[in-house]
Amino acid sequence: MEKVKPKLNPYADIRKVSLQGTDGTSSSAFAIQTDTGKSGKGKWKEVGVVRDDYLLVSNQQVFDMANHITQQSPLNWEVKKEFFNGKSFGLYYTAKDQTKTIDSENGVKLGDTVALGLHFLNSYDGSKALTAGLHLERLICTNGMVTNHGLGSVRILHDKSNAKWENDVEKILGLIDSSDNQVSNMMSAFSEMDRSILDEAMLRQIATNVIPNISDSTFGKIYRNFSKESKGKDNATVWDFYNACTNVLWHNPTQTRADFTNNAYVTDRMIDFANKELI
């Protein structure tokens, strides 16, 4: 399993405490604190301030929930990635028995297989509601492909102690069961990318018009990765460039939430480009 920021324990104890003014008056806000001490020494650190009605679910509860859901699913799920920066948490699974293969110009492209992924997102500072969603993973390089539009997600409104929690579980399982058409649509766009030769004019078009919100520094990393991986190839494709994007954004050794946001941005924009310009 790929871990990001391993020095932070995503499953440390957490608590929600009322805030008070300097004169002792109560505040309507609450502080979220995590125990950063070794072996539960009670060294509490504030990681966020939220409202009284904020549903605080610990990352341990999220892990238990994810484990319950993946056990209920008929697919064989494996934890592939874990992200935690002290405030935001992500747990990413892959089902290697639920795959599709890129359809190249000469038929099915051997060895380029994409698997269904399932992720759970949580935050301690209120920046992200507890959510479960689907993504894809290219198995040959373990690049994750996140999307805001291509695949569904479920906002989880209850914790395991709530009787309505099972409703959320059923919604997530239904999301998995009904994903085939959505995945097929994404694979169709990926196949068009794979059939499309990337020349300098198209690369400029992508940089300027398709993914203009990617910063110059990030685009530079993507271009270096693309140049390295396509060295010696007669005809690099749009698919090669897109995978350079996801490689940089998924495997950043100093990963931030912005990498996941940019991953979804690039994926959605490139799929839209493929559907409108390449077909």
Cite the ranges covered by each PLM segment.
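Feature for intrinsically disordered/low-complexity regulatory segments and propeptides
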Residues: 1-67, 249
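Intrinsically disordered, low-complexity regions enriched in serine/threonine
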Residues: 1-22, 98-279
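Short secondary-structure junctions
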Residues: 16, 69-83
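A near-ubiquitous, low-amplitude feature marking generic local secondary-structure context
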Residues: 28, 45-49, 76, 155, ...
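Intrinsically disordered, low-complexity coil segments
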Residues: 36-44, 73, 100-112
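A broad "ordered helical/assembly scaffold" signature
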Residues: 49-50, 85, 172-176
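Beta-rich nucleic-acid/ligand-interaction surfaces
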Residues: 77-99
